[in-house]
Design a protein with these regions (language model features):
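Gly/Pro/Ser/Thr-rich low-complexity, intrinsically disordered segments predominantly at protein N-termini
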Residues: 1-178
Length: 178
């Protein structure tokens, strides 16, 4: 039987937790669980890390009533994603978020993969989803989530100031991208 013909055993979030508990996966392994399949994430480079650091500093000050989480799990239908940043309502320490006010993916080489996540974030009720395309110096902003995806998608470039739905201070694209 060819692999393409064989049934696939899909993992659950609980399966992955047991794998971590057994030492099969390490907590620091960079994976996402998409439709029950573990997907390796690209290791962050210098540009990616600098952009995430800038956004983290900005969001902590701009959204004081929320938690800013960096590369943490967001539970979604069929698994979990690990966005670069998310702004969530405060939760008890033993709970992972299943939605967010804002999710940001910083893309240096992963633009196409990050674009495929939009429908998952919309179905999870994420109010805003941003894809920061570092090489293109643009930010694609998705708003108005629904079952079929986001109803409003706009692209912003150098010189733009993007308001944050939960924040008090807009993001200056030029300052963010250096």
């Amino acid at each position: 039987m060819l692999c393409a013909e064989a049934p696939i055993h899909r993992l659950s979030v609980e399966d992955v937790r047991r794998m971590v508990d057994a030492g099969v996966l390490l907590e620091e392994d960079r994976v996402e669980l998409v439709d029950g399949v573990l997907v390796d994430m690209t290791p962050p480079g210098a540009e990616h890390s600098a952009t995430v650091a800038w956004l983290t500093r900005h969001l902590v000050g701009a959204a004081p009533r929320h938690e800013v989480r960096v590369q943490d799990l967001l539970l979604v239908e069929g698994g979990f994603l690990m966005p670069d940043l998310m702004v969530v309502d405060p939760l008890p320490r033993d709970r992972q978020p299943s939605t967010a006010a804002l999710v940001i993916e910083v893309s240096v080489t992963t633009q196409r993969y990050d674009a495929t996540k939009a429908s998952r974030y919309a179905r999870a009720g994420v109010s805003e989803y941003w894809i920061v395309d570092v090489p293109a110096r643009t930010v694609q902003v998705h708003r108005r989530p629904g079952p079929a995806g986001y109803g409003d998608i706009a692209r912003h470039g150098d010189g733009a100031r993007i308001p944050i739905g939960v924040g008090t201070s807009p993001v200056d694209v030029s300052a963010m991208l250096g």
